[in-house]
Regions:
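Cleaved targeting-peptide boundary
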Residues: 16-20, 158
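Secondary-structure boundary elements
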Residues: 19-107, 113
Length: 359
């Protein structure tokens, strides 16, 4: 977190200026590890939103994490998963949503691709997570699992969500990201992590490791597709690499799937990232730079916001209004309080950044 509390000329005005407690704003981390994102202007997204009435699924809910839970639950309820029968080859989101109520041998790949499209359609920044425990022996939990991570503006963090099981993991009531689940697995086997399910986030009993996606050990190893525009480009393959967080554990161990070394090693398809912040980049969060020039504060805004519509500013108790990437505010006394935020094409607002400007 960083503080933006800006005063000029205090030496001659300390008696007239009432200094408030420091302002803590969300930390900005740019996107340097991932490539393309879904394009909300693509016709397929309009079809998805309208045909399946996604607005109805989140009607009246303004908290974005609760919206995510509602959309996850909606998808989980819509797709009828049957354990028997032929595997369904087409993993396109629209076909899963269309045929899902009829039932079929759907699994994590279908659900993660569909949830990625549903969340994206409603403006949430999301990505597919591919994971596994990575063990060579025993092999009872040695395959892979597909789920999703979504950036939550209200929590200002990434959260791992699983549509197949309508669940996610929490520690002390805080939803965890994929890397945070992995941290707990490597630390002590995730003893203090709970899997919670449904809209009411009810804790679930611990299950055996062979229950895919229902155990934290599923996330001992994690990768993310580097290209995030699968739905926009369908049926084209978005290509790209598998982003792998290369910490000390990843450098000194090998990821196994089904008893064999992960295919991406020999194929040269791992994009190894040693900087954790590059993986846990901060969508929608602002990077604000300020400079005092004479009687004005010059403000410059940047961000890594997919599908950015505009930046907005709110002065004091006024209304939100559009803000340019660069603008100036004349210095006043008492201090000028300013809120800034990003807004994407779906109308979702990013975390607010607060400035207190004064002479």
């Amino acid at each position: 977190m960083k503080t933006i509390l800006l005063f000029a000329g205090l030496a001659g005005a300390l008696g007239a200026v009432q200094v408030e407690p420091p302002v803590k704003n969300p930390a900005f981390r740019p996107n340097t590890a991932f490539g393309s994102h879904e394009d909300l202007r693509a016709p397929r997204f309009e079809e998805l939103r309208v045909k399946y009435r996604l607005e109805e699924a989140v009607k009246g809910e303004t908290d974005d994490f609760k919206r995510v839970l509602l959309l996850r639950h909606w998808l989980h309820a819509r797709v009828v998963v049957e354990k028997k029968g032929p595997e369904l080859p087409d993993k396109d989101a629209l076909s899963t949503l269309e045929e899902g109520p009829k039932g079929g041998r759907y699994h994590c790949a279908h659900l993660s691709v569909a949830l990625n499209a549903v969340l994206s359609a409603m403006g949430h920044v999301t990505r597919i997570v591919l994971s596994g425990p990575g063990e060579k022996e025993p092999a009872r939990l040695s395959g892979s699992h597909g789920s999703n991570e979504v950036w939550c503006n209200s929590l200002c963090k990434w959260v791992l969500v699983d549509a197949e099981h309508d669940s996610h993991f929490e520690k002390d009531g805080v939803p965890l990201s994929a890397l945070e689940v992995r941290d707990e697995v490597l630390r002590d086997g995730a003893k203090s992590v709970a899997r919670v399910r449904g809209l009411d986030r009810r804790p679930e009993a611990r299950v055996e490791d062979e229950s895919w996606g229902q155990t934290a050990r599923t996330y001992g190893w994690i990768s993310w597709p580097s290209e995030g525009n699968r739905f926009t480009r369908y049926p084209e393959d978005p290509g790209g690499f598998q982003v792998l967080y290369e910490d000390e554990y990843a450098r000194t161990h090998t990821w196994y799937r089904d008893g064999r070394k992960h295919w991406a090693y020999d194929a040269g398809r791992f994009k190894r990232i040693s900087e954790r912040g590059a993986i846990e980049w901060t969508p929608n969060v602002l990077d604000v730079k300020t400079r005092l020039q004479g009687e004005e504060w010059e403000v410059q805004i940047a961000s890594s916001t997919p599908n950015l519509k505009e930046y907005q500013m709110k002065k004091g108790d006024g209304a939100w209004e559009r803000a340019e990437e660069k603008f100036a505010i004349r210095v006043k006394a008492p201090p000028e309080k300013v809120l800034l935020r990003s807004v994407n094409l779906a109308g979702l607002c990013g975390p607010e950044q607060r400035l207190v400007l004064a002479r």
